Amino acid sequence: MLKSRLRMFLNELKLLVLTGGGRPRAEPQPRGGGGGGCGWAPFAGCSARDGDGDEEEYYGSEPRARGLAGDKEPRAGPPPPPAPPPPPPGALDALSLSSSLDSGLRTPQCRICFQGPEQGELLSPCRCDGSVRCTHQPCLIRWISERGSWSCELCYFKYQVLAISTKNPLQWQAISLTVIEKVQIAAIVLGSLFLVASISWLIWSSLSPSAKWQRQDLLFQICYGMYGFMDVVCIGLIVHEGSSVYRIFKRWQAVNQQWKVLNYDKTKDVGGDTGGGAAGKPGPRTSRTSPPAGAPTRPPAAQRMRMRTLLPQRCGYTILHLLGQLRPPDARSSSHSGREVVMRVTTV
């Protein structure tokens, strides 16, 4: 509507410029009787008759210029787009196939490299099901060499692998080690060498007849005590860091040995109750009847983990309580508040 008004205003302005404003324009009369008309410019949906009457009222009966008379001519617009052709029957089959693949009937893929069977045979080595069920044997061996664990991180099932043979020493590959792992290996090696040398010298010095004068010397007796203390420290260091170095060795062994990974066999799964989560397969079916009253029941995995966590705390609390009982009565009564605070912190 606003566009139509602006167009008519410009046409009036052109007409006034061309005619010089000699003849006054008659005011438009409302159409349709008394008060029935709107008095506004014609809408696009008005009839041709109403439009001609309005133009005659505005411009009169004098001939107009081509630019003014051609405003009512329809403008040629862009042609309508052609209708799309009907899809062939093969396209419908392909669409239904893609929808069926998206709905879950997809080709199995390796959960590590996300490749299909074209990259190698897909195995199912653990209880996991669904999209994380299959994996390639080389991908699994590489994953084990990086993590150092031979169990699935989702269902906690230990992979069933068979060692075929060790690779040629010329084909051995090094594994990536962090700074902490290098320090652990160095501590184990140096501690073992010192422990072997110290124990060998102590045994020779205590049993050899030629070392009788050493056993009687005070300086050597002090050395015996120092070497004994260092031997205890080395044994504790080896015990503490032994598990970490053993995992590093298992990683190296996974890379430099040929393996055969076996598929998951539900009939041979004796630890099916330890698998957890929605990603794991259910273990072997057990009887739904309740066990006998006298039969021992095995606590679940979560309860066993909680017991392992609480056991050191309870042991520490018990030792602290026994040490408090060994104190004299006066000292125990004077430091009762401080001991209570320490016991509470240890329990938390």
UniProtKB/Swiss-Prot annotation:
Biased composition (Pro residues): 76-90
PROSITE patterns: ZF_RING_CH (PS51292)
GO cellular component, one term: trans-Golgi network
Principal subcellular localization: Golgi
Coiled coil: none
Residues spanning the membrane: 185-205, 219-239
One example of a Gene Ontology biological process annotation: protein ubiquitination
RING-CH-type Zn finger ranges: 102-162
UniProt keyword tRNA processing, yes or no: no
Reaction equation(s) it catalyzes: S-ubiquitinyl-[E2 ubiquitin-conjugating enzyme]-L-cysteine + [acceptor protein]-L-lysine = [E2 ubiquitin-conjugating enzyme]-L-cysteine + N(6)-ubiquitinyl-[acceptor protein]-L-lysine
SMART domains attached to this UniProt entry: RINGv (SM00744)
Pfam families: RINGv
Annotated Basic and acidic residues bias: 63-75
Domain of life: Eukaryota
Role description: E3 ubiquitin-protein ligase that may mediate ubiquitination of MHC-I, CD4 and ICAM1, and promote their subsequent endocytosis and sorting to lysosomes via multivesicular bodies. E3 ubiquitin ligases accept ubiquitin from an E2 ubiquitin-conjugating enzyme in the form of a thioester and then directly transfer the ubiquitin to targeted substrates.
PANTHER family cross-referenced by the UniProt entry: E3 UBIQUITIN-PROTEIN LIGASE MARCH4-LIKE, E3 UBIQUITIN-PROTEIN LIGASE MARCHF9
Name of the protein described by the UniProt record: E3 ubiquitin-protein ligase MARCHF9
